Amino acid sequence: MAKKVTGVVKLQLPAGKATPAPPVGPALGGYGINIMAFVKEYNEKTASQAGSVVPVEVTVYSDRSFTITLKTPPAADLLRKVAGIEKGSGTPNRKIAGTITKKQLRQVAEQKMADLNAFDIEAAEKIIAGTARSMGIKIVD
């Protein structure tokens, strides 16, 4: 028989640097799971992606065990790295924060494809282009 799920917790944590302090402790403590075990497993799985934020979905079961599902980094983080900027524009339609090429846009879309509601790469590119536009990142040919 399958284990009964008691909750699903979604967190965005720095890769390889999770600690039991907030936000991890309070978010997972209510479910009664071993927070140190989660932190250790998360840090091992994300050690290779150091420097980026990695979203994680923690499924908690009735016997206080859990499974970790890692997602791809947020599109905004990927776009910031590709554009080489610290943060997006505060006024996206007036001030351009940076530029990326269509080739770079396609690379980000391919990386995010698994987590997007898109059936083909062109649809994924449109989703990522919208995120870039809202951040003040201009897409050039």
From Swiss-Prot:
Key words, A-Z: Methylation, Ribonucleoprotein, Ribosomal protein, RNA-binding, rRNA-binding
Coiled coil: none
Its biological purpose: Forms part of the ribosomal stalk which helps the ribosome interact with GTP-bound translation factors.
Modified how: One or more lysine residues are methylated.
SMART domains membership: RL11
InterPro entries attached to this UniProt entry: Ribosomal_uL11, Ribosomal_uL11_bac-typ, Ribosomal_uL11_C, Ribosomal_uL11_C_sf, Ribosomal_uL11_CS, Ribosomal_uL11_N, Ribosomal_uL11_N_sf
Pfam families xrefs: Ribosomal_L11, Ribosomal_L11_N
Family: Belongs to the universal ribosomal protein uL11 family.
Protein name (database record): Large ribosomal subunit protein uL11
Biological process per Gene Ontology, one example term: translation
Gene Ontology CC: one annotated term: cytosolic large ribosomal subunit
Subunit-structure text: Part of the ribosomal stalk of the 50S ribosomal subunit. Interacts with L10 and the large rRNA to form the base of the stalk. L10 forms an elongated spine to which L12 dimers bind in a sequential fashion forming a multimeric L10(L12)X complex.
Lineage, highest ranks first: Bacteria, Bacillati, Chloroflexota, Chloroflexia, Chloroflexales
Gene Ontology molecular functions: large ribosomal subunit rRNA binding; structural constituent of ribosome
